[in-house]
């Protein structure tokens, strides 16, 4: 097993405290597939149990807990404010990932007083497209509430989910978030779950999008804009490697993992029913239940299968394995195989060894298996 050397003192827990939500987004993994048969929320005692289990984990591994609290919309949980006070008393930092509908200046000031570091909302297109994905009026309200967050001193974060459906609108979204003085902007790719979202984005189309966004980012940074552009997708590493913006460190140790996907490294997801998942976007990645299992034990047992880096069919042969590995969630959603090639990765050759990376046959078999053709 490769060692991980992220050099991070924080360990992140993405925590879904409720499924309750004001929207039914077309790309939401909670309502994908057969749909969410029952909206679940944790009880107050269960939430205290989760905090204690996460604190125990961090004590064992000498980390600091950092919660990404989400749902649904977490603010709809009946004990939301009790949780905010608990985290404040324990001095545990957190980000909220929710909707704009229940935010105003007073609520944002209260969140800031409880220690809220960042508040993440979504923009998945310009007005018509975003409101189609989410609900009418969502776009304008999201833009409006950025100001509430900024005035309260909470870092406003906008995340976009990219697919073939909206990829051509991402550059316009960048302009919009800069104009609104968003503090952080990032995008990640849609994980196929069925439904009305077009998933046919080709590797070269996605690379072109990164090229366009990179030019925009540089222009805005040069102009001194307030927005920080977080290059969240790990295929940014491949793009920057090709364009000379990322160099392989000369002192990198063989077998070490320095970056790339955090699944199995410094991240755990806890769902509203207590299920512990390696990644929320990998729908079949349940490894335990937070009410039945000690997270510190799960980490060295059940989570181990997500740290077998030599199993990556394409990435294991690539010189960027220690820094990239694409998005296994997208690979899994496309082919049903966590270790399959990332469908938007355009790299075909190891530039150091000359070895071919493209594994058409393996990817084809995975796709045919998923479609029931084999």
Predicted features, each with a name:
Residues 34-41, 132-138, 199-203, 333:
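Short glycine-enriched, charge-decorated loop/helix-capping segments at active-site entrances
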Residues 205-250, 275-326:
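C-terminal accessory region of radical SAM enzymes
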Residues 1-117:
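Conserved alpha-helical substructure of the radical SAM core
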Residues 34-35, 74-76, 100-105, 118-136, ...:
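Conserved radical SAM core fold
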Residues 1-7, 255, 271-275, 279, ...:
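Radical SAM enzyme core and accessory elements
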Residues 16, 54-69, 88-95, 116-120, ...:
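Conserved C-terminal portion of the radical SAM core fold
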Residues 261-265:
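Short, small/polar residue-rich loop motifs at catalytic or cofactor-binding pockets
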